[in-house]
A protein has these predicted regions:
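A long, amphipathic alpha-helix that forms part
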Residues: 178, 199-203, 384-441
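Metal-dependent active-site segment of extracytoplasmic phospho-/sulfohydrolases and closely related
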Residues: 216-217, 418-462, 510-514
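C-terminal, low-complexity/hydrophilic appendages and adjacent surface loops
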Residues: 546-565
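Histidine-centered active-site microenvironments of extracellular/periplasmic hydrolases
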Residues: 231-236, 437-487
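Active-site-proximal alpha/beta segments of enzymes that process anionic O-linked groups
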Residues: 154-396, 474, 502-535, 540, ...
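Transmembrane and membrane-interface helices of multi-pass
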Residues: 1-174
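A short beta-strand-to-alpha-helix junction
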Residues: 277-284, 401, 409-420, 464-473, ...
């Protein structure tokens, strides 16, 4: 009876956590690749059986944890996104580890379901009988003695496929071993790349003193630029129109990438489209340029707390920042952006020297509930309002309703309420307090949001690996100032580049505003064109496969189709 129960639980573990294998087989079709696919599955099933019947208790426990955890992560990912988790997705999840509480709240039902399927595996591997007691298995007892070492075979097999196919080829492979193969390939690749290259110092010529008193960059979170009132009739109220003639709207812009960490990293180091992977390691940071230009550097992080860093920021980079500000954990999510607005207003009012301020706003990362007050519901119906705690990463959000159409309507309405509050309230506080006669403020966002309006399954809003829909890369791009000389240049820039700008153009524009020689900027291939130059027709592209290796090519996506890609 125990033997039968053990086999049933193992089958539940393997088959239940590997959804879509049949569809994957159909996709591969009758070709040599199907033989490789089947061979890996045979290896995986055999090694799972060996570890389940291994006589040594410590060996079973040692392998239970990685096998179950890898299964849980990959299966949860598939339940949430309706896609297999690949190597690039795995790396993105590691980069987004700080947002894990968001997932535990919003997708709690799917996580519980995945956990129950994986629990079957944990029980099956560790319950009796074992090889030394299961009479029919004494003939293979020699193999179970080496069960721990033999677990490496499917890991190496999947890793070899990943390595030879540029990080691809793991779709439909056993989730029990995929994650371990991802770790191996990532580690081997890092070892082969060797130590990181040294960063270059700032070599760009500067004209002298800082020409503008305060330069502020606001990198909002998860904002679709085409849903805002500045770009859409009857769009979401942002409060930006109150800036009147000081508002220079470049329309919808393309982000650097469709994921927060990639966009923020690329932005802070001023990468170009052609060499971004090298430049994130070798370029001087925006802080270095600002300090050389005579600016005091300030970073306001509205998302993390207690010194936790995000978006690939390192302790070395932090040392370039004169004032590093994170918010008190007692602030509720919907209180954070208004608090930042008041903090910024005070900074601008009391500054006694030139300052460069970079802000990562709280914004509207999912889940959207808890990021606006209960009395600020304009778009209805919404997801159920609930208290999410005081952390930057909210938890315990009510799960979606069963009906997909109703869920999607509520999902999007909650998002619209969130951006209405977090952008609108921010600028309602900041604009009256700003002296735009000596300040330039740039407002954009790290990526857009995909609401699957075309009926595609899943609730993945951004960070798609591979070809991505345009909505993931559509962000706003606005500049606020009333400095006459700058306003004249911006007016000309908007006339030339409305709905043509990219975030890649913002960094060199900031350097020009800081007083770096524009002729040097124009003549250097180390920078994209500024917003003051006429931008090329195919300028609005964003990355959805950012970190590439093993011969794989990055994936670029347009937010507007203007001919062949």
């Amino acid at each position: 009876m125990l033997l039968a129960c053990k086999f049933v639980l193992l089958a539940v573990f393997l088959l239940g956590t590997n959804l879509g294998v049949y569809q994957r087989v159909k996709m591969i079709g009758w070709q040599p690749g199907l033989v490789v696919f089947a061979f890996v599955w045979i290896l995986a099933c055999a090694t799972i059986l060996l570890i389940a019947f291994a006589p040594r208790h410590r060996v079973r426990l040692f392998w239970t944890l990685p096998l179950v955890v890898c299964s849980f992560v990959a299966f949860s990912y598939q339940l949430i996104t309706a896609k297999f988790m690949g190597l690039a997705d795995f790396e993105k999840l590691i980069g987004l580890a700080g947002f894990v509480d968001n997932v535990t709240g919003f997708f709690g039902d799917k996580l519980v379901s995945a956990a129950l399927w994986c629990l079957a595996g944990a029980v099956a591997i560790n319950m009796p009988p074992y090889a030394r007691r299961a009479g029919g298995f004494r003939r293979v007892a020699w193999a179970t003695e080496f069960a721990g070492v033999l677990q490496l075979i499917p890991i190496m097999a999947i890793g070899s496929i990943l390595y030879t196919r540029g990080g691809e080829g793991s779709d439909g492979m056993p989730v029990q071993y995929n994650g371990l193969a991802f770790l191996v390939v990532t580690g081997v690749d890092a070892a082969l790349q060797g130590p990181p290259q040294a960063r270059s110092p700032v070599r760009l010529a500067h004209g002298g003193a800082a020409p503008i008193r305060s330069i502020v960059v606001i990198m909002d979170e998860s904002i679709r630029g085409d849903l805002l009132d500045i770009n859409l009739p009857n769009g979401v109220d942002t409060g930006l129109k109150n800036a009147d003639s000081a508002l220079f709207n470049f329309g919808v812009s393309s982000s650097i990438a469709n994921c927060s960490d990639s966009t923020n990293l690329g932005f802070r180091y001023g990468v170009t489209k052609a060499r971004y992977l090298r430049e994130i390691h070798t370029n001087p940071s925006i802080w270095s340029y600002a300090k050389k230009a005579g600016y005091r550097t300030v970073y306001i992080d509205g998302q993390r707390h207690s010194g936790r860093l995000q978006s690939h920021m390192t302790s070395e980079e932090v040392r370039e920042i004169d004032e590093f500000i994170q918010l008190d954990t007692q602030l509720k999510p919907f209180e954070k952006d208004p608090y930042i607005a008041r903090l910024l207003a005070k900074m601008l009012r009391t500054a006694n020297s030139p300052q460069f301020v970079f802000i990562n706003k709280m914004g509207a990362h999912f889940p959207y509930e808890g990021k606006y007050p209960r009395d600020q519901v304009v778009y209805q119906p919404t997801m159920s309002l609930s208290y999410l705690g005081n952390e930057s990463d909210p938890t315990n959000l009510a799960r979606p309703a069963d009906d997909a159409t109703e869920t999607r309507l509520r999902f999007k309405n909650s998002y619209l309420n969130s951006i209405r509050w977090n952008i609108g309230e921010f600028f309602r506080i900041v604009l009256p307090a700003m002296n735009l006669a000596n300040t330039v403020l740039v407002f954009t966002a790290d990526h857009g949001q995909d609401f699957h309006d075309d009926g595609r399954p899943g609730y993945r809003t951004h960070c798609t690996h591979g070809p991505a829909v345009a909505d993931e890369g559509i962000v706003p791009l606005v500049v606020l100032t009333s400095i006459p000389a700058v306003a004249t240049q911006l007016r000309s820039g908007v006339a030339m580049n409305y709905n043509r700008a990219s975030q890649f153009n913002v960094f060199p524009t900031l350097l020009a505003l800081m007083g770096y020689e524009r002729e040097s900027l124009r003549n250097s291939d180390a920078f994209e064109p500024t917003l003051f130059a006429e931008l090329p027709d195919d300028n609005q592209r964003f990355l959805s496969t950012f970190f590439v290796r093993l011969g794989k090519k990055p994936v670029w996506n347009r937010i507007v189709q203007r001919g062949p890609q």
